[in-house]
Amino acid sequence: MYTSETTAEIIHDLILINNDRIDGYTRALGNLKDGSDQDLRSLFEDYIQQTTQFNHELNPFAVINGEETTEGKPISGKLHRFWLDLKASLSGHDRKSILEECERGEDASKKAYEKAIQESPDLPIHIVSIIRNHAQKQKAAHDHVRNLRDAAL
C-alpha cells in the first residue's frame, strides 16, 4: 500500500546513491592525469550534472510529514556502499582502472534504481515515471562507461 513514508524512503535511497555517484565522479576527475583523458573529464562532468538534475527532480518527493529526508542517516545504507568503496579506492590509477571503478559504482546505481522500480507499483505514476526515466539514463551511462573500459588499454 502506498504511503508518503514509502515514497520518501524510496526517494531518499535514490538521492543517497545519487549523492555518492556525484562524489565518485568528482574523485575520479581528481585522479585523471593532467592534460590527458579530456574525453573522460567531459564525460564525468556530464554525469555529475546529470545526477544533480536527478536529485533536483527527486527532492520534492523526499518529504515525510513536511520534513525533508535528504539529510542524515541513510534509510537503506547498503544501496550506496559500492560508490563509497569507489571513493576509497580511487588513488591515481590509470584510465582503465578509473573506468573499472566507475563501472562498479554505476552497477550499484543501477541496482538501486532497479530496486526502486520493483518497490514502486503502488507509487503515484508521475513518480514512477521520473524513476524509470532516471533508470534509463543511468543504464545508458553504465553501458557507456563499460564500453570505454573495454576499449581502454
Residue ranges and their predicted role:
Residues 6-16, 36-56, 98-102, 126-137:
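Alpha-helical scaffold segments that form or flank carboxylate-/histidine-based iron centers
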Residues 38-76, 145-148:
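Conserved alpha-helical segments that form or flank metal/cofactor-binding pockets of metalloenzymes
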Residues 5, 30, 49, 63, ...:
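Small-residue-biased structural context
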Residues 19, 48, 52, 66-69, ...:
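Residues at alpha-helix boundaries and short interhelical turns
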Residues 10-32, 80-126, 130:
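Acidic/histidine-rich alpha-helical segments that form the ligand environment
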Residues 1-9, 36, 60-66, 88-96:
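Short, charged, low-complexity loops and linkers
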